[in-house]
């Protein structure tokens, strides 16, 4: 058959036997085996020679005119087809309709097959057309101006979903509703995960009580049987004299004239978390803690309003420290070191005033406190505190929705809000949840109808059990500890975003400072119309993320840059954590609530767009140069002490210098990078997004010291702890531990050096003589 075909083809081109070889017209892609056979001159000569030898006869050469004409015709046709295909494909890329170039139903593009895209093609899809930044800002603003946030807040505070304590039926119902909303918004995907965690609640069989004991008459007076409580308090009974410790900060305890050893203490709410107040009291050997809301700071008319909090000096489920509480997890018999060993209870202002009636000594005027305040109980009076809280296992749901990125879907920014609340939770959880839902709807609409094509993915998260120490968020982080820092590059927290109108406050990782400054310059205050950027010195006013902020575990535990912001006043919002945290009270306190919500949504929205729009990640790694330099300056104050121990700071100076050079080199690499080369840009972005994670100390266990960040974490491995330890040598040398100090200095230095090495890139690019 082949011989016959060859003979016929030979006859067609002048009767000359021909030989062919395979030659690809185009570069082979994904194993394409399409070829055109071309005649080779060498083969022709060899074939002629063979024929002459085989036949022993001379064969006259045929005329070649017809063959040249055919070859020319084929070449012209081929060049025409190739030109047509190049023009067609170029037109497709420029026009970019929704589903590629339109073609009749059931047909495919010429010369293509129905094959699955290769992994490389799927990982780096074709670059979508990009809108200008000004167009995106306008698109976001227009959609925000047509959004009624207060309507969403209102239905979140309907009786169907209030109160919604973590694990309750109403909390679960709202979780399912949010998941359905994500589906209605046509997000790329929505899902939920469940955790089984232990929380502490009030006992249904025994009351918590605070009583006054008259030691002379043995009479006992009930001050209060509080409705509120503090989760994770030790369940026990203690009796002793009562001492006022102002807010219960470390400085407050240091300034006390009366010792609290063997006594109960009473502290005002505010300034620091309940857990920190209890930890400070415990460090001074107090027996127990009472917390109340004074009228000077919390001007609530009703003096009997109960309130709630937790005393766990940490985040997540304290009975599964460092590992996730999924249903299949085999829970070891362990608990967090942050659990208190003393009882703690919230009391109403009315109960506190009863206690003050049995105390003596005026409180210092510097405290700026109610005139009824007294310092300590009289010599013949004691206070008895009984806490009967019990543990309860609950199931909680975290709900997620994602808009997948068009170029790097495996890199994502996470935006989240707490869903649960003890009490109505209007300001505490409804505001954040409303912002989350509306932003998910708006961004989905921008993608589906507005032409916005984010390069990276946007994940929307609704957390449960936030009131018990960001349990939902922390358990999720623990569940994906080994991979999240490689994928999630920023967390934006929406909790308590609107508590007032006067100020705009931010707590964030230094990596986000530059992005925040750009955003503040772009966004106007919803009421005054002035730029949110008012002070060039704003960075020095940034507050550290607190333990009760859901952004804290992202930064300190997982090493993911995080930001939390709020419109608020200089004073505390009075109803947080109380039964008066109602929508009506929030709307009364902030009459222009909808405008403020639009402003908060615009801040979050611009952050999201900037983080998913630009080629380079908007994370300013150079900001940590200032942080490291500040630490080195602090250490220089103790050069004499360090020298007396036979140590020096040369290694620290070297590590600091290497980090500075690494940041400079990365900046140079970025400036010289080819923007259209996605592989190069991705490699640079990967180095940037790992900076925060590289400051997690690799020398401590996530289980024993979960907050491993040397700048923002807690524990002896942190840089602030190292400085405090050196201060202790000057104040109380007998309490100083030189062996610990040597370890602290060495491990801190190596952590900074490791961060510098990682930022430098490949090992052959690391240039240091450490």
UniProtKB/Swiss-Prot annotation:
Q: Which gene encodes it?
A: TFRC
Q: Which organism is it from?
A: Canis lupus familiaris (Dog)
A Gene Ontology BP annotation from the UniProt entry: receptor internalization
UniProt-annotated stretches for the region Disordered: 102-122
Q: How does it assemble?
A: Homodimer; disulfide-linked. Binds one transferrin molecule per subunit. Interacts with SH3BP4. Interacts with STEAP3; facilitates TFRC endocytosis in erythroid precursor cells.
Name where it's found. Cell membrane; Melanosome
* Protein name listed in UniProt: Transferrin receptor protein 1
Q: Write out the PTM section of this UniProt entry.
A: Stearoylated by ZDHHC6 which inhibits TFRC-mediated activation of the JNK pathway and promotes mitochondrial fragmentation. Stearoylation does not affect iron uptake.
Q: What Gene3D superfamilies does its record include?
A: 3.50.30.30, Transferrin receptor-like, dimerisation domain, Zn peptidases
The answer on whether this UniProt entry bears the keyword Transcription regulation reads: no
């Amino acid at each position: 058959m082949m011989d016959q075909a060859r003979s016929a083809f030979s006859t067609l081109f002048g009767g000359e036997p021909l030989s062919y070889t395979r030659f690809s017209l185009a570069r082979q892609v994904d194993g394409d085996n399409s070829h055109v056979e071309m005649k080779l001159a060498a083969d022709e000569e060899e074939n002629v020679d063979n024929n002459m030898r085989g036949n022993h006869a001379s064969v006259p050469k045929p005329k070649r005119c017809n063959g040249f004409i055919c070859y020319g015709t084929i070449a012209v046709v081929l060049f025409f087809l190739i030109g047509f295909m190049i023009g067609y494909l170029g037109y497709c890329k420029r026009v970019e309709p929704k589903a590629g170039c339109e073609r009749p139903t059931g047909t495919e593009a010429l010369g293509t097959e129905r094959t699955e895209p290769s992994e490389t093609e799927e990982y780096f899809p074709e670059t979508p057309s990009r809108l200008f930044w000004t167009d995106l800002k306008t698109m976001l603003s227009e959609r925000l101006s047509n959004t009624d946030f207060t309507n969403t807040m209102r239905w979140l505070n309907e009786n169907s979903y209030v109160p919604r304590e973590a694990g309750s039926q109403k909390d679960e119902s709202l979780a399912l509703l949010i998941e359905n909303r994500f589906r209605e918004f046509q997000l790329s995907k929505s899902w939920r995960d469940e955790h089984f965690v232990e929380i502490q609640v009030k006992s249904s069989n025994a009351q918590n009580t605070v009583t006054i004991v008259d030691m002379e008459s043995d009479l006992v007076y009930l001050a209060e049987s509080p409705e509120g409580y503090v989760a994770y308090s030790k369940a026990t009974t203690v009796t002793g004299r009562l001492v006022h410790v102002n807010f219960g900060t470390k400085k407050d305890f240091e300034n006390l004239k009366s010792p609290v050893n063997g006594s109960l203490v009473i502290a005002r709410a505010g300034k620091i978390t309940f857990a920190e107040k209890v930890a400070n009291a415990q460090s001074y050997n107090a027996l127990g803690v009472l917390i109340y809301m004074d009228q000077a700071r919390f001007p609530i008319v009703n003096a009997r309003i109960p309130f709630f909090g937790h005393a766990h000096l940490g985040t997540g489920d304290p009975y599964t420290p460092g590992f996730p509480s999924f249903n299949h997890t085999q829970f070891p018999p362990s608990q967090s070191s942050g659990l208190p060993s003393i009882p703690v209870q919230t009391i109403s202002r009315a109960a506190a005033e009863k206690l003050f009636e049995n105390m003596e000594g005026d409180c210092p005027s510097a405290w700026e406190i109610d005139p009824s305040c007294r310092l300590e109980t009289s010599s013949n009076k004691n206070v008895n505190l009984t806490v009967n809280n019990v543990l309860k296992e609950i199931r909680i749901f975290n709900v997620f929705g994602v808009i997948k990125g068009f170029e790097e879907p495996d890199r994502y920014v996470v935006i989240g809000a707490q869903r649960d609340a003890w009490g109505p939770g209007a300001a505490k959880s409804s505001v954040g949840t409303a912002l989350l839902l509306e932003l998910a709807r708006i961004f989905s609409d921008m993608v589906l109808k507005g032409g916005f094509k984010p390069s990276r993915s946007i994940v929307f998260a609704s957390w449960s059990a936030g009131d018990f120490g960001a349990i939902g968020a922390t358990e999720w982080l623990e569940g994906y500890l080994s991979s999240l820092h490689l994928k999630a590059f920023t967390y934006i927290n929406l909790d308590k975003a609107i508590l007032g109108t006067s100020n705009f406050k931010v707590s964030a990782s230094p990596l986000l400072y530059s992005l925040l400054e750009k955003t503040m310059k772009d966004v106007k205050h919803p009421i005054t119309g002035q730029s949110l950027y008012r002070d060039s010195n704003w960075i020095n006013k940034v507050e550290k993320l607190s333990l009760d902020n859901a952004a804290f575990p992202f930064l300190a535990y997982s090493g993911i840059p995080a930001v939390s912001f709020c419109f608020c006043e200089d004073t505390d919002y009075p109803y947080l954590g109380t039964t008066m945290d109602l929508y009506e009270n929030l709307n009364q306190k902030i009459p222009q609530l909808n405008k403020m919500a639009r402003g908060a949504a615009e801040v979050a929205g611009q952050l999201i767009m900037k983080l998913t729009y630009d080629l380079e990640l908007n994370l300013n790694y150079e900001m940590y140069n200032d942080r490291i330099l500040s630490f080195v300056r602090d250490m220089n104050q103790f050069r004499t002490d360090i020298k007396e121990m036979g140590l020096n700071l040369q290694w620290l100076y070297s590590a600091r210098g290497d980090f500075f050079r690494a940041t400079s080199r990365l900046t140079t690499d970025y400036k010289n990078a080819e923007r259209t080369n996605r592989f190069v840009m991705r490699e640079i972005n990967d180095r940037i997004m790992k900076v925060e994670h590289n400051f997690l100390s690799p020398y401590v266990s996530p289980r024993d010291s979960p907050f491993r960040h040397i700048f923002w974490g807690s524990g002896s491995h942190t840089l602030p702890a190292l400085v405090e330890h050196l201060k202790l040598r000057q104040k109380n040398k007998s309490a100083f531990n030189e062996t610990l100090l040597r370890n602290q200095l060495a491990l801190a230095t190596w952590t900074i050096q490791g961060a510098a090495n990682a930022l430098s890139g490949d090992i052959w690019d690391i240039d240091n003589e450490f």
